[in-house]
């Protein structure tokens, strides 16, 4: 990721920025809203050759919308070379993971990096397998940290000039919990994170249930980061 700053007027690579309040609620790991927001950039190589855009769910998931847009707006041959970075408020579901894998098989010279704010229905075996399949196909998947949030704020959000450094800082514990669960998915371990949403008041709670297999296979630094070892 190459950091760029400044108002929209000096960023011709971006067609639309989202508003600060949109970014805050879409990418807060504690928020369990149904809609998905995708911020993406395509690097075609060379100087000044980065496309940036934003997308939200329509009648299709944002991942499918992106693939259709990418393959139909202009002609792309199988030898197309580019690097794509996605910043997703939710991780891909199982069906979207399959669509992404098929897309990458048709365009073998496309590299995809995915940063996610939350794991979508992470206890569903289909979603877990889908993420593993993506990783097996060469996709890099990571949980968004403060560094990625700041990058997205500067490059995808319509912030006022005086608020360039004032992007939302989310609780580190929630980020670490999703990192923990993502490791469980990658290693083929049972889910250990359970997330509950209470309607009154509007708060999100979590519980952790570790089995012996988690202690045996999860990297110690991941357990230490969440205070579990």
UniProtKB/Swiss-Prot annotation:
Instruction: Kindly give the InterPro entries that the UniProt entry links to this protein.
Output: APOBEC/CMP_deaminase_Zn-bd, APOBEC1, APOBEC_Cyt_Deaminase, CMP_dCMP_dom, Cytidine_deaminase-like
Q: Cofactor comment in the record? A: Binds 1 Zn(2+) ion per subunit.
What is the active site of this protein? 63 (proton donor)
GO annotation, biological process:
cellular response to insulin stimulus; cytidine metabolic process; cytidine to uridine editing; defense response to virus; DNA cytosine deamination; establishment of localization in cell; lipoprotein biosynthetic process; lipoprotein metabolic process
Q: Give the tissue specificity.
A: Expressed in the liver as well as small intestine.
Matches recorded under Gene3D superfamilies = Cytidine Deaminase, domain 2
The highest taxon in the source lineage is Eukaryota
Any Gene Ontology CC annotation: nucleus
Which GO molecular function annotation, any one, does this entry have?
Answer: ribonucleoprotein complex binding
What Pfam families has UniProt attached to this entry?
APOBEC4_like
Tell me, in one coarse class, where this protein mainly resides.
cytoplasm
Positions of the CMP/dCMP-type deaminase domain: 10-134
What's the Enzyme Commission number for this chain?
Answer: 3.5.4.-, 3.5.4.36
Location relative to the cell: Cytoplasm; Nucleus
Residues recorded as binding Zn(2+), renumbered to this chain, are: 61, 93, 96
UniProt keyword Zinc, yes or no = yes
Cofactor(s) named in the record: Zn(2+)
Keywords for the protein's UniProt record, in alphabetical order: Cytoplasm, Hydrolase, Metal-binding, mRNA processing, Nucleus, Zinc
State the family named in the UniProt similarity comment for this chain. Belongs to the cytidine and deoxycytidylate deaminase family.
Q: What does the record note on quaternary structure?
A: Homodimer. Interacts with A1CF; form an mRNA editing complex. Interacts with RBM47; form an mRNA editing complex. Found in a complex with CELF2/CUGBP2 and A1CF. Interacts with HNRPAB. Interacts with SYNCRIP.
Q: Which PANTHER family match?
A: C-U-EDITING ENZYME APOBEC-1 (PTHR13857:SF26), MRNA EDITING ENZYME (PTHR13857)
Give the protein's function.
Answer: Cytidine deaminase catalyzing the cytidine to uridine postranscriptional editing of a variety of mRNAs. Form complexes with cofactors that confer differential editing activity and selectivity. Responsible for the postranscriptional editing of a CAA codon for Gln to a UAA codon for stop in the apolipoprotein B mRNA. Also involved in CGA (Arg) to UGA (Stop) editing in the NF1 mRNA. May also play a role in the epigenetic regulation of gene expression by participating in DNA demethylation.
Name the UniProt record assigns to this protein: C->U-editing enzyme APOBEC-1
Gene that encodes the chain: Apobec1
């Amino acid at each position: 990721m190459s950091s760029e700053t400044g108002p929209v007027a000096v960023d011709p690579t971006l067609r639309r920025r989202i508003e600060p309040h949109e970014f805050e609620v879409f990418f807060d790991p504690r928020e369990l809203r149904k809609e998905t927001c995708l911020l993406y950039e395509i690097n075609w190589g060379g100087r000044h050759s980065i496309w940036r855009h934003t997308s939200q769910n329509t009648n299709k998931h944002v991942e499918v919308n992106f693939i259709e847009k990418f393959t139909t707006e202009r002609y792309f041959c199988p030898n197309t070379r580019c690097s794509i970075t996605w910043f997703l408020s939710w991780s891909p579901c199982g069906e979207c993971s399959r669509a992404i894998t098929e897309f990458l098989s048709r365009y073998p010279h496309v590299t995809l990096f995915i940063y996610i704010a939350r794991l979508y229905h992470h206890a569903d075996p289909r979603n877990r397998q889908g993420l593993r399949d993506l990783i097996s196909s060469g996709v890099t998947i990571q949980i968004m940290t403060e560094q990625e949030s700041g990058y997205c704020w500067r490059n995808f959000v319509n912030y006022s000039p005086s608020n360039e450094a004032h992007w939302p800082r989310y609780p580190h514990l929630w980020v670490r919990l999703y990192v923990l669960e993502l490791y469980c998915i990658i290693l083929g371990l049972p889910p250990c994170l359970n997330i509950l949403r209470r309607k009154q008041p509007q708060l999100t709670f979590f519980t952790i249930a570790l089995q012996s297999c988690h202690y045996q296979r999860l990297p110690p630094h991941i357990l230490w980061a969440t205070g579990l070892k």
